[in-house]
Amino acid sequence: MPDYLVTLESAWYIKEAKTLDDAIGIAISEAGKRLNPSAKFVEVEAGMLACPFCERELSSAIVVADTALVGLILEMKVFRAESKEHASRIAKSVIGKALHEIPLKLLDVQEL
């Protein structure tokens, strides 16, 4: 059975964020706290989006009225899964249990 790298996207809501950098830092920190110790093997980083006009990469975070929405990328290696679908279900289950009500979206599954 092969191993897989599963990439998920999550949306993180932050209150009282003064700057974009603060919001991203808080989101990554809070995600890390929730993932540790049950899913400490999950990599967390700030998400990026492609601009539809110029195709440059933009931060997937926005701050309005001291409230932020930050897109995070979560990567997890899944070992000995039966298929890509099985690997994605395992990753969503493990990460979803740790993050509780945070929305998750599957972005990619790669065989290692």
UniProtKB/Swiss-Prot annotation:
Protein name per UniProt: UPF0212 protein Mboo_1659
Species for this entry: Methanoregula boonei (strain DSM 21154 / JCM 14090 / 6A8)
NCBIfam families: PRK03922.1
Family: Belongs to the UPF0212 family.
Matches recorded under InterPro entries: UPF0212 (IPR007564)
Cleavable signal peptide: none
Superkingdom field: Archaea
